[in-house]
Structures are given as structure tokens and as C-alpha cells.
A protein has these predicted regions:
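ATP-binding N-terminal substructure of ATP-dependent carboxylate-amine bond-forming enzymes
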Residues: 1-125, 135-147, 397
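ATP-dependent carboxylate activation and anion-phosphoryl transfer catalytic cores
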Residues: 7-16, 20-24, 48, 71-73, ...
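A structural signal for short, well-ordered beta-strand elements
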Residues: 59, 112, 138, 171, ...
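N-terminal phosphate-binding caps/lids of nucleotide- and nucleic-acid-binding domains
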Residues: 122, 154, 167, 187, ...
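Acidic/histidine-enriched active-site and ligand-binding environments that engage anionic O-linkages
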Residues: 148-157
């Protein structure tokens, strides 16, 4: 087992990693910026190292400082969490070449899956269903591009190969605007990602976002841990997630899940990962793979009983996954609300001091958060301050528990998006299940 781990992150995920390390008897090193001296996990870690000023670029994205922290504390491994450097192949490479274990896949696999074109090709080869598209980057031959668009069928979407988070994409509904749209997306991609490679895909009008959680070890084992539905989104950012996805049968789950597990073995995957799909009319279409732990991992933990972060640490120690595929049984239903320090009407961040805090409790209620009364939410980072997760034997119970838990939650001193969650959970279409990825934005358009 690993002896000492550097937690190269902040906030709730850093605390989540610290808890898993403590349960396994692993010593922890919290690296932090000058703005984060009072973070919960920093106060609880065995050792702490300040790696730079408040700006992420000079601290949490500062590769030499993080590796130096591992060196001075004689750590074995670095856990990147999510966000920041978690999907940075150069970081993974430097961690391993400096003699430490990167808790995640190899740099080569991160590179392969980080480039959308190579990822789609790898998935097709492994038998994972993909969105019909250009099968590679678009050339400057407009006649050829028009031909591809005709074959796929309008509407189509032009996407940047190095893009993500909703940037570098443009929907095209007819041939008249195709040439201009490709040129504009290329220019945007060059400016944002320093890579003007773009590709074309069929644009699905009303899909759901359904993703498959996987784990793979270094002994040739890979398992899938059911699916999550993350369709409740605003500006491509997930707001509410749930597991399992409403309406997905065990047979469908087994088919898509086993394909993902097989793909993990074929690409030499290691650790926790997620295959993201668009799901429309009973069909799955692969969009990307996240080569890290995800924000919404707790809903999967609640319905499977597996501690995903502990499994990450075990796999990084060279141990096999602690269970077999047939041991995984989906039981009950879980819902997660991402609680952000933001104005619920304008969505602008609302940093500041938490004056009073009362977190909810009771049967089937989980509160993953680093905040406490007296803690100041800094303005420099992502606005998520907590994740509230509820579990029930059926979906209706999980939703009702979430409504109760939200009504119990008191966070005074800053604004939060709890009113938005109340609105979503009260919505009759959400309660029925199966809303698509555009639903929330349309609903908010009606409420503005």
C-alpha cells in the first residue's frame, strides 16, 4: 500500500481524498495556495506545503512546485483530484519521470483520450458506439466537407478537437452556413486551445447525458459500475446528477457497460474513469472519456457500495480491484445537488465569509463539503462549496429526501444556488425522469 500521498487539489475533493487515505492508513500531504491556509483538509493533513499565491496558475497549476512538495515530504504518489492538472498528460508524465506514482492513467492514455479525434477512433475500434461523424479532422476542402455533412445529415455540429466544457463548438443547420461555421470554429479553437483542428458530428437535438463509471487495474481487470444521468445542465455545467439513469434496463446497462470495460482493457486504462455518452431514442453515442475521478462519483458509491477513491488508491498501490464484476449489484437510487456560492438569479459567484452553517442529516443523506462556520469562500476558484447527496430505495424517496435535506440546509453570509435546486426538484418533468440536456436552460428561460 502507498505510504504517503500528495493531494494536489483543494476544496471538497481534497477532503474526500484525505478521508480515503486516512481509512487506508496512508499519510497525507496537503499542498495549498496562500488563500487556502484555512481549508478543512489543510488543517487535517499530516503535512502541509504552501505552493504559491492565490492564482491557480501560480499554485494548483504550478507543476514544479507540486513535484517539489512531493520531493521534500518524501511522498510516494500524487492524487490530482478533478479539474486543475487531473487530465494534463504532461503533468502525469513529469510526476512519473520524477519517481512518483500518478494516481490515474498513464500519460499516453490521457493524451489518447484527451484528443477527441483519437479518442473516438480508439472507441470505434473497441466497439463502443459513437456519434456518426467525419472520422477525423476536417480538411480545407469545402466540397469534401459538404459531402461529409450530407452523408451525416443536417443538423451537424463542428467541434474543436482540443475543446471541452462547451467551448469550441458550433451547430450548423444547412449547407449555406457550413463554410463560415468551420472557419469560425477553427479560429476560436486556435485562440482558446492553440489547436485549430476541428471535426464534424451529427447534432442530436434532444439527447440525455448518460455516463458509465469504470475502474481498471494493472492486472488486466476492468469493471463498470452502472451509469449516471447528468442531463440537468446549464451552459454545459452539470447541476443535478443521479444514479442509476431513469429508464435504463439491466440488459442495456450490461451491454454498454461491458463494452466500456472491454475498451479499458484494450487501451491499457488504469484507475477510475468515466465514459460520457449522449443518449437519444434508446441509442448511446460516445462523446468523451474523463480520465479522472468525477465530481458526481458519490451517487455511484451510494448505489453500489464501492468507495471509488479508496479503489483509486489501491490500484495505484499495484493491487487488483477488490471485487469482481458479478459482485456489483445496483441497489436503490441516489441524487446529487451541486451547491455553489453564487447568486441563484444571475449565477454570478458570491464569495465571502460563511457566518452560520447547518448541514443536513438523517438516513440516506450525505454532505460532502469543506466549508464550516467562519470559513471564507475565496474569489479565485470554482464556486462549488458542497455536494448534497441523498439515497433512497426508490427514486421518489431519494428526491423527497433531497427536498427535505435542502430545506434543512442553512448557509448564511453568502448566496447559494439552493433556490435553483428547489425549483428543479419541484419540477414535474424532473420528477417523472428522463429530461434532456436542454431542459434546464429552457426552463430558466421561462423563469427569467
Amino acid at each position: 500500500m502507498l505510504e504517503k500521498v500528495v493531494i494536489a487539489n483543494r476544496g471538497e475533493i481534497a477532503l474526500r481524498i484525505l478521508r480515503a487515505c486516512k481509512e487506508l492508513g496512508i499519510k497525507t500531504v496537503a499542498v495549498h495556495s496562500t488563500a487556502d491556509r484555512e481549508l478543512k483538509h489543510v488543517l487535517l493533513a499530516d503535512e502541509t506545503v504552501c505552493i504559491g499565491p492565490a492564482q491557480s496558475a501560480k499554485s494548483y497549476l504550478n507543476i514544479p512546485a507540486i513535484i517539489a512538495a512531493a520531493e521534500v515530504t518524501c511522498a510516494d504518489a500524487i492524487h490530482p483530484g478533478y479539474g486543475f492538472l487531473s487530465e494534463n498528460a504532461d503533468f502525469a508524465e513529469q510526476v512519473e519521470s520524477s519517481g512518483f506514482i500518478f494516481i490515474g492513467p498513464t500519460a499516453d492514455v490521457i493524451r489518447l483520450m484527451g484528443d477527441k479525434v483519437s479518442a473516438i477512433n480508439a472507441m470505434k475500434k473497441a466497439g463502443v458506439p459513437c456519434v456518426p461523424g467525419s472520422d477525423g479532422p476536417l480538411s480545407s476542402d469545402i466540397a469534401k466537407n459538404k459531402e461529409i455533412a450530407k452523408r451525416i445529415g443536417y443538423p451537424i455540429i463542428i467541434k474543436a478537437s482540443g475543446g471541452g466544457g462547451g467551448r469550441g463548438m458550433r451547430v450548423v443547420r444547412s449547407e449555406d452556413t457550413l463554410e463560415e461555421s468551420i472557419a469560425m470554429t477553427k479560429a476560436e479553437a486556435k485562440a482558446a486551445f492553440n489547436n485549430d483542428m476541428v471535426y464534424m458530428e451529427k447534432y442530436l437535438e434532444n439527447p440525455r447525458h448518460v455516463e458509465i463509471q469504470v475502474l481498471a487495474d494493472t492486472h488486466g481487470n476492468a469493471v463498470y459500475l452502472a451509469e449516471r444521468d447528468c442531463s440537468m445542465q446549464r451552459r454545459h455545467q452539470k447541476v443535478v446528477e443521479e444514479a442509476p439513469a431513469p429508464g435504463i434496463t439491466e440488459e442495456v446497462r450490461r451491454d454498454i457497460g461491458s463494452r466500456c470495460a472491454k475498451a479499458c482493457v484494450e487501451i491499457g486504462y488504469r484507475g477510475a474513469g468515466t465514459f460520457e455518452f449522449l443518449y437519444e431514442n434508446g441509442e448511446f453515442y460516445f462523446i468523451e472519456m474523463n480520465t479522472r475521478i468525477q465530481v458526481e462519483h458519490p451517487v455511484t458509491e451510494m448505489i453500489t457500495g464501492v468507495d471509488l477513491v479508496k479503489e483509486q488508491l489501491r490500484i495505484a498501490s499495484g493491487l487488483p480491484i477488490s471485487f469482481k464484476q458479478e459482485d456489483i449489484k445496483v441497489k436503490g437510487h441516489a441524487v446529487e445537488c451541486r451547491i455553489n456560492a453564487e447568486d441563484p438569479k444571475t449565477f454570478l459567484p458570491s464569495p465571502g465569509k460563511v457566518v452560520h452553517l447547518h448541514s443536513p442529516g438523517g438516513l440516506g443523506v450525505r454532505w460532502d463539503s469543506h466549508i464550516y462556520a467562519g470559513y471564507t469562500v475565496p474569489p479565485h476558484y470554482d464556486s462549488m462549496i458542497a455536494k448534497l447527496i441523498t439515497y433512497g430505495d426508490v427514486r421518489e424517496v431519494a428526491i423527497r429526501r433531497m427536498q427535505n435535506a435542502l430545506s434543512e440546509t442553512i448557509i448564511d453570509g453568502i448566496k447559494t444556488n439552493i433556490p435553483l435546486h428547489d425549483l428543479i426538484l419541484d419540477d414535474e418533468n424532473f420528477q417523472k425522469g428522463g429530461t434532456n440536456i436542454h431542459y434546464l436552460e429552457k426552463k430558466l428561460g421561462m423563469h427569467e
